[in-house]
Amino acid sequence: MASRRLLLLCLAGLVLVTEAGPTGTGQSKCPLMVKVLDAVQGSPAVNVAVRVFKKAADETWEPFASGKTSEFGELHGLTTDEKFVEGIIKVELDTKTYWKALGISPFHEYVEVVFHANDSGKRRYTIAALLSPYSYSTTALVSDPKE
């Protein structure tokens, strides 16, 4: 029970840190941002490969965007407001490669977060993940765009 409370506290802190974020990064104009933390090291998860897909009319997943997390465990600039229209989005984090690079054999191959974007009008999405080799937790911060 105590470990669950600690995990929830960490995730809440992650969202607050993400919202506060460094100034001057342009994140307020970014409609989709990913933030990843390493729960083992207690630090940002650097160089995690992220792939974003959009569900097509034929129910297949079309590649939409990709990148790697920064030294802050963040990935900005995946898309623009013009391109990020309503639809089903899948964000995939390559956790296996991340852990293998640290010499750790993980349980999960990757983390997937699937959600309906912009179904209630334009929004900003921050997908946050807290990783360990045998578990992960995700949360999302959805907000109205700031002009």
UniProtKB/Swiss-Prot annotation:
One MF term in the entry's GO annotations: thyroid hormone binding
4-carboxyglutamate PTM positions: 62
Residue numbers of Sulfocysteine PTMs: 30
Any one GO biological process: purine nucleobase metabolic process
Tissue: Detected in serum (at protein level). Detected in liver.
One GO location term (cellular component): extracellular space
Function: Thyroid hormone-binding protein. Probably transports thyroxine from the bloodstream to the brain.
Residues carrying a glycan: 118
Gene3D superfamilies, A to Z: Transthyretin/hydroxyisourate hydrolase domain (2.60.40.180)
Family under the similarity heading: Belongs to the transthyretin family.
Top-level taxon of origin: Eukaryota
Entry-linked Pfam families: Transthyretin (PF00576)
Cellular compartment(s): Secreted
Signal peptide: 1-20
Organism: Sorex araneus
Coiled coil: none
Gene that this polypeptide is encoded by: TTR
Alphabetized UniProt keyword annotations: Gamma-carboxyglutamic acid, Glycoprotein, Hormone, Secreted, Signal, Sulfation, Thyroid hormone, Transport
Binding annotation for L-thyroxine: 35, 74, 137
Post-translational modifications reported in the UniProt record: Sulfonation of the reactive cysteine Cys-30 enhances the stability of the native conformation of TTR, avoiding misassembly of the protein leading to amyloid formation.
Major location category of this protein: secreted
Protein name, as recorded: Transthyretin
SUPFAM superfamilies, sorted: Transthyretin (synonym: prealbumin)
Oligomeric form and interacting partners: Homotetramer. Dimer of dimers. In the homotetramer, subunits assemble around a central channel that can accommodate two ligand molecules. Interacts with RBP4.
